[in-house]
Structure formats: C-alpha cells, structure tokens
Design a protein with these regions (language model features):
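Short, glycine/charged-enriched hinge/interface segments at domain edges or termini
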Residues: 2-19, 69-232, 237, 377, ...
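Intrinsically disordered, low-complexity, positively charged segments
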Residues: 11-73, 77-81
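Structural signal for hydrophobic packing residues in well-ordered secondary-structure cores
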Residues: 29-33, 51, 114, 157-163, ...
Length: 424
C-alpha cells in the first residue's frame, strides 16, 4: 500500500491552484513499492520500473532501405551517369560476406545487409540496367537509402526511461531489441464508493427523489483505463460514523481511495469530517471549475503501517470527470511511478463569448466544427451545468481557460483538450 505522511499534500492557502497541486504531488508523494516482470504481450499500459537498456543496436547492422543497387559513393561521377558492373545479389536475411570493389554495384533488396565497402543505395527505378552492368545517375548523396547500425538506437543506450507508460510503440521497441519481458511497477489498487442517501444502484428500486449512481461507473472506467485495479465498495449513506468506518477499512490493501459526493459544506456532507476523524484532510478546495470542492489527504487503517491517499470528488458527474482528469490523474501517475504528463492544449478559434472569474482554471465543454472559412472552431454545449452528463457525450473535449483570463470573444483562440488526451 502507499506509505504517505500526513503532510504529503500540505497547503496552507484557501484555494489551491492546479499548478501548485501538481507541484506538491511531484514533490511529496512517492511511488508505491512493488515490481513485477511481465511478458511483452501483457506490458501495454504498465509503467517501467527502471530504465530499459538496449542490449543490441537498432538496427543491428547496416542495411538497405529500398530495393536497388548498393554502390561506393566514391565511384560516382559528379558530371553524369556512372556505369558499374553488377557483381552480386543480396536478399534480406541472407548472411553476407560480400565485399564491394571499386567500379562495382551489388543488386540488393530492402532489409538486406550492406556489402562491406558500400555506403549508398540507388532505388531500382532510378537506374538503367544493361546486361551485367547498371548505369546510375549523378546527384545522389552519400548514405542515401541506407540504414546504418545503431542509427535508431545504439547498444547500451536507454531505450525506455523508467516511468514510461507503455503503449504499443514502446512494446514494439522492446521487441525490436530482442526483449521478451519487462520489469514494471505493480498496478495501483484503488477503492471507490459513492455517498448520499439520494443515490441508488442502477437497476434497483428508485424512489421519487432518488437518482441512479453514475459516478462509480465513470470512476471505475477511468481508473481501469489508466491501469489501476479497482475495488467497488458501492454506495454509502450520509452517516458520519459509517463513512469513517468504511474509509478506515478501505485504507487496508489499497493505495488510493476515491469517493464522490459529500465533500462540500452542506449539513449532509460528512466525508470531510469522516476523513479528519481517521486521518488528515490537508486541503479540500481547488481553484477549478467545475469541481471546486475536491478533498485530498491521507487516511490511516487499523495498523500504523497502513495508510492510503484519499481524494474526495464532488457529486455532480461532470465535475467528477473534470476533477478526475485534472486532479486524480496526476496523483495516480505519481503513485504508479509514471513520469509526469504534460498536456498540450491545441489553440482553436472560439465561436462564442464567455466570462469567468479570475484566479481559477475553468473548463468548458465544446464541440469542434469547421467555420465558413474552413478553420476549426469550438462551439459551447448549450447546457453547461455540472450535472448534465450529455454535455460530455455530445462534445469533443474541453476548452481550458487560464486563471488570468476573465473573458473571451468570438474569434479568440483558446487551448482545446480532447477527451482522448485527457483520459489516456
């Protein structure tokens, strides 16, 4: 489980800016212990535990990038065509002990090892073959159409840094240097539950003032997409003692506990008090909209050696989504040993006017369309309440308004974050 100190997220201000939150996580939260070796076919989505060093060069030998003729560049005329004798033939995979001599060319195919002495390859469609000779044109640069040993990755270099979240391309690189297994961090173990007397299980009996619980399903899907092992603890009622017991029990065997609902200041919002009764709630408001009431802290189990990070999210599902991708995800990456992720909002033209308060980061759900001039522009969803789930299903991503922005007008450019980028 996560070994955390009570002040690991410590912040003394009333509203925590997102940049300060990310800095505190990076400085004061340590990755969980535990490393395991997995085969390449099971490695996607896992986090490398150590630097992966290339045991061989990539490519391991000089080879041709095309079907054509290997030559010595020193033999080529700068004034016109050069006629060379075709002295051999090399296929991909064939063991080559051929050495090219002055005035010769070797017929070669893509991937075949370059003959000793050759440094340049002419594509077959650029030459003229006449019996046992080939005429090659002037102007080709030394090394053209050739792939040299180690140009992709020299032997002994870092192929994959520690903290890499492995995707298909990383697994392919590991295979290309001959590896069959990788050492990765163990998966994070995360417990989730929803709170509220008004929340019921989907498919269950719903009285007139109740709503079906969507938040646990949203959180489970997001967590599993990021590689965590999820324990679903269901729905807890608004009972302070019951919440405290559930939190205390959930800290055992889990690295992180994530809840939704009950972190605001209402009379029925008991999560904050429950956390403070069994641990430390070190901040509970972040300068973000939607989702300002976000609690983060540490909860302790029955044993003094057991503790888990805690995040309490708001109850509205859109606020849950936004705060998860911008608050929980950086914490997950740090706990899992992954390198920090830098989001790069792409500037798009805004097709609406908007005003916001200063000193908070704000996210607006938008769809992308082509303007009359063909340029991409963002259109705000007509309903922007934090409980409007269709505002997530009917849009393409979020516009990110920085803390110092107070208004935008049609035609302004604002950073756009796609849902795919936010969730991966």
């Amino acid at each position: 489980m996560a070994q955390l100190t009570d002040d690991c997220f410590a912040f003394s201000g009333p509203l925590l800016p997102l940049t300060d939150m990310e800095r505190l996580i990076g400085e004061r939260v340590a990755p969980v212990d535990g490393v395991e070796r997995v085969p390449l076919r099971l490695a996607r989505g896992r986090v490398t535990a150590d630097d992966v060093i290339a045991p061989v060069a990539l490519p391991p030998f000089d080879n041709s990038a095309v079907d054509g003729y290997a030559v010595r560049h020193a033999d080529l005329s700068a004034e016109g065509d050069t006629k060379l004798a075709v002295a051999g033939r090399l296929m991909a995979g064939a063991q080559s002990d051929v050495a090219i001599r002055p005035g010769e060319a070797i017929r070669i195919f893509t991937g075949a090892a370059m003959p000793a002495g050759a440094d340049t390859v002419f594509m077959q469609e650029d030459v003229t073959v006449d019996g046992d000779t080939v005429a090659v044109p002037k102007g080709l640069k030394r090394g053209a159409n050739s792939r040299f040993a180690g140009e992709d990755l020299p032997a002994g270099n870092v192929a994959l840094p520690a903290g890499t979240v492995l995707d298909a391309q990383h697994v392919a690189l590991a295979a290309a240097i001959g590896l069959t297994e990788l050492d990765v961090r163990r998966r994070l173990r995360v417990a989730i539950f929803s709170t509220g007397d008004e929340v019921v299980e989907p498919g269950g009996l719903r009285h007139g003032a109740a709503i079906y619980d969507a938040n646990r399903f949203l959180l489970a899907a997001l967590l599993e997409r990021l590689g965590a092992e999820v324990t679903d603890l269901g729905i807890l009622s608004d009972d302070p003692d019951g919440l405290a017991r559930a939190l205390k029990n959930s800290s055992a065997g889990h690295d992180l506990v994530v809840t939704s609902g009950g972190v605001s200041t209402g009379e029925a919002d008991h999560v904050r008090g429950a956390v403070e009764a069994i641990g430390s709630l070190v901040f509970w408001r972040i300068a973000i909209k939607p989702g300002r009431p976000v609690a983060m802290g540490v909860i302790r189990g029955a044993s003094h050696n057991e503790s888990a990070a805690f995040v309490g999210l708001p109850g509205n599902p859109v606020a849950v989504f936004v705060t998860f991708v911008r608050v929980v995800k950086p914490l997950l990456r740090r706990l899992s040993g992954a390198l920090p992720q830098t989001l790069h909002p792409l500037p798009v033209r805004v097709a609406f006017a908007y005003k916001k308060k200063k000193d908070r980061r704000e996210y607006v759900r938008v769809s992308l369309r082509r303007g009359v001039d063909g340029e991409l522009e963002a259109v705000k969803h007509p309903q922007d309440g934090a409980g409007i789930l269709t505002s997530l299903t009917e849009t393409d991503g979020l516009l990110e308004f920085a803390e110092d922005v107070t208004s935008v007008a049609p035609g302004d450019r604002v950073g756009f974050l796609s849902y795919a980028d936010l969730m991966n």
